[in-house]
Amino acid sequence: MAESIQSLDQLSQLKGAVTAPDAPKYEKKVDKFGRAYATGKRKDAVARVWIKPGSGKVTVNTRDIEVYFARPVLRMMIEQPMVVAARKGQYDVICTVAGGGLSGQAGAVRHGLSKALTNFEPELRSVLKKGGFLTRDSRVVERKKYGKAKARRSFQFSKR
């Protein structure tokens, strides 16, 4: 093949003829019960999320979402991936979440729900990725240092 190329023009023509590899194809991942599963994490919280086609009922640790997450902001945060993907009310969501506080748990459920949606409908991946729902939020609490009152706050200083 190298012998057949005589000039740079022929090389550029050959380069154009070679096709670029296609984007990776994502498959639908569903268990025998027709549910998609994913794990989401945020701070110290870990959420295990299952989704299946249904009426839009969201259950967190065997309790309704309104009972478990009383603050409307947290509920809105969890429902964001469904709203962005235009799938609100089409899937039943069952999740178990442990560790951390309510804000971290809501973030973990949101992350897991986004991943489960992409497992159920791979074509939603680009929409959710663009919205930043598939990216793990890696921010965690900064550790306390010795010689300091907290992570960065110093002890009170007295000149005299």
Curated annotation (Swiss-Prot):
PROSITE patterns: RIBOSOMAL_S9. Keywords: Ribonucleoprotein, Ribosomal protein. One of its GO terms (molecular function) is structural constituent of ribosome. Signal peptide: none annotated. Pfam families: Ribosomal_S9. The keyword Lipoprotein does not apply. The keyword Ribosomal protein applies. InterPro entries: Ribosomal_Su5_D2-typ_SF, Ribosomal_uS9, Ribosomal_uS9_bac/plastid, Ribosomal_uS9_CS, Ribsml_uS5_D2-typ_fold_subgr. One of its GO terms (biological process) is translation. It comes from the Bacteria. One of its GO terms (cellular component) is cytosolic small ribosomal subunit. Belongs to the universal ribosomal protein uS9 family. This is Small ribosomal subunit protein uS9. It comes from Bradyrhizobium sp. (strain ORS 278). The lineage of its organism: Bacteria, Pseudomonadati, Pseudomonadota, Alphaproteobacteria, Hyphomicrobiales.
